[in-house]
From Swiss-Prot:
Source organism per UniProt: Streptomyces coelicolor (strain ATCC BAA-471 / A3(2) / M145)
Pathway linked to the protein: Carbohydrate degradation; pentose phosphate pathway; D-ribulose 5-phosphate from D-glucose 6-phosphate (oxidative stage): step 2/3
Record's keyword terms, sorted: Hydrolase
Known EC number: 3.1.1.31
GO BP term, pick one: carbohydrate metabolic process
Superkingdom to which the source organism belongs: Bacteria
Molecular functions per Gene Ontology: 6-phosphogluconolactonase activity
The protein's name in its UniProt record: 6-phosphogluconolactonase
UniProt KW Hydrolase keyword: yes
Record PANTHER family: 6-PHOSPHOGLUCONOLACTONASE (PTHR11054:SF0)
UniProt cross-references to Gene3D superfamilies, sorted A to Z: 3.40.50.1360
Annotated function: Hydrolysis of 6-phosphogluconolactone to 6-phosphogluconate.
Broad class of enzyme this protein falls into: hydrolase
Amino acid sequence: MSDTPQLVVHRDKELMAEAAAARLITKIVDAQASRGSASVVLTGGRNGNGLLAALAGSPARDAIDWSRLDLWWGDERFLPEGDPERNVTQAQQALLDSVPLDPKRVHAMAASDGPYGSDVEAAAAAYAQELATASVPENHAAVPSFDVLLLGVGPDTHVASLFPEHPGVRETERTVIGVHGSPKPPPIRISLTLPAIRAAREVWLLAAGEDKANAVAMALSGAGEIQAPAAGARGRARTLWLLDSAAASQLPRSLYPPASA
């Protein structure tokens, strides 16, 4: 497990999105070259969608073999199919509808009008099973070994739909949970848990804007994961925080080098 996070601080959110997109393209291409395919977990929110939009506008996107890319989601709002607030809907608009993905490798979480109806626990269990099925048998793992797992960081330090002091952040056994009573609307969601997040080779946390500065400082200054879920999001090989200068404004300069982009 990567215990020491790496920080890269960019001048503004636009540069952060462009740089993160370039990093992601390189990571996907390298994974496909070495293992034949790549697996990425997407995140919603303004920073996650900003990254996808930057990727869509990058000429280098054509270096990716989109037919050999598995896409998963870290969380989802449990709303009807096509709802504009669903993360998958926003991802489709930002990027997915413009690239030649294999539909069988786009692993969206169930909608509230899908096969499980309003039963969010059944929908979460089904996604956990889909993850387990996709895992390489010899790894004996409950989830695939994601190449990159993207996470936005909320102003309260939440990641995915794991909120401070909420039951979901305390989950240690299941890989996917139904979230009830989310402090951020809508109240019902589906989320990966911290154990599932930590199965990723690399976890990249994205934060931009002054409203994220306190959360970033708290997560990187020794807070516990129950109080600051972002502090518990770590990759097996690498944990990377991609920030703009506003989000990094409350961090001591000793935490990141002056040469940050």
